[in-house]
Amino acid sequence: MFEIREKPEMVERAMLVSVYFDPSEAGEKQAMLDELEDLVSNLGIGIAGKHLIKSRDMHAKFLCGTGKAQEVKQLALDCRADCVVFDNMLSPSQQREWERLVDECVIDREEVILDIFARRARTREATLQVELARMQYSLPRMARMWNHLDRQGGGSGGGKGGGGAARGEGEKQIEVDRRLARARIEAIQRELVLVTRQRATQRKERERQAVATAAIVGYTNAGKSSLLSLVSGSEVMARDMLFATLDTTTRKIELPHGQPLLLTDTVGFIRNLPHRLVEAFKSTLEEAVLADFLIQVVDASDPEAVRHYETTLEVLNELGAGDKPMIVVLNKVDLVPEERRGALETLLAPHFSGRVVPMSVKEGNGEGDLLNACVEMLESRVRRARFLIPYTRSDLVAAMHSEGKVFSTEYVEEGTLLEAVLPVAFYNKLESFLADR
């Protein structure tokens, strides 16, 4: 959790604040404040209160005006919060000003998300990616850690000299810390370059084998990992918590027509996902960019389902994957009335021209429809046919096994008779060997 400045104990009660300026934004800001409550609760911190603060204008010092800032200070005192969490992204200087005003820990939405990511990271790659994002966030904020030296020096025996000595010590240490942080950032970036190369090698091997790929994307906690577990028949960690999955998990499945498909689960998205996290996780999120198509999972039971769908598209556009072919899975339809399901499909229609598959992943309903939708998606990439290969071309038989899926093999007088599903490019090369011409 977050350490309170000048106190060794940990944060127990946080007051949540969202500052907004346009009255028409009040509804959306309230929804985001509710989401922030879920995020903070995922850190094990109690909620002392949450408040929407309307400000006429944006101010550089506190984001809102001084009068509103004093109002926030009083609210924090009244609810006995030991931390104030802003849904707004605060600049380093705004964060410092707020901490001076309320005399408690002040953090923003980005720091909350970074802390959750740090707790969820399991693999070396995910740990490095989160560490990189956190250090880039902390670098311009290092002066906060030494604020207490100013206060201690100014209030203890040395008068001006004591304060200057404390400040001097703090300033020297800040510079040392910054140099160490920059060196660590560079070291992490070098290590992540190696990870990116390893991923590229793995992708080339998959391309050589001509195995189709799909990436499962969507808002955090929409049911992506549960979907992968269902269709692959293998256990994938799926927990009812935000950002349970930070590491990509890939499973090979077989579609109804026999073609193999590699399905990859990806990290969940969220509104205002910090750009530095998107950058840090680029090597992981490339799985979505380079997949043949996407499966976006939408929690149909969530009142913000359409907004979550739009947020996912925004992040995909940022990654350069916004134009990928996509299947949309409306998950948890067992929890919503029929008319709500129809309304959702209508609301998605202006944004999406692909296939919508209603499912209840938890109940196992709709799996067949999804697999058939995947077959339809890949039909333009593969062909199924019978081939008669002369015995003198055993190299082609071996290639058919490695490049596609062979269903049957029969040895006849003229050669080897095979029924197979092949990628279109390889199929075209073998058209002269079609058995049913």
Curated annotation (Swiss-Prot):
Q: Where in the cell is it found?
A: Cytoplasm
Region entry Disordered: which residue ranges? 150-173
**Cysteine-cysteine disulfides:** none
Supply the alphabetized keyword list: Cytoplasm, GTP-binding, Magnesium, Metal-binding, Nucleotide-binding
Q: Which residues form the Hflx-type G domain?
A: 212-382
Instruction: Look up keyword GTP-binding and say if it applies.
Output: yes
Q: According to its UniProt record, what is one Pfam family this protein matches?
A: MMR_HSR1
What function does this protein fulfil? Answer: GTPase that associates with the 50S ribosomal subunit and may have a role during protein synthesis or ribosome biogenesis.
| Record's protein name | GTPase HflX
Q: Which organism is it from?
A: Akkermansia muciniphila (strain ATCC BAA-835 / DSM 22959 / JCM 33894 / BCRC 81048 / CCUG 64013 / CIP 107961 / Muc)
User: Taxonomic classification, please?
Assistant: Bacteria, Pseudomonadati, Verrucomicrobiota, Verrucomicrobiia, Verrucomicrobiales
The gene for this chain is hflX
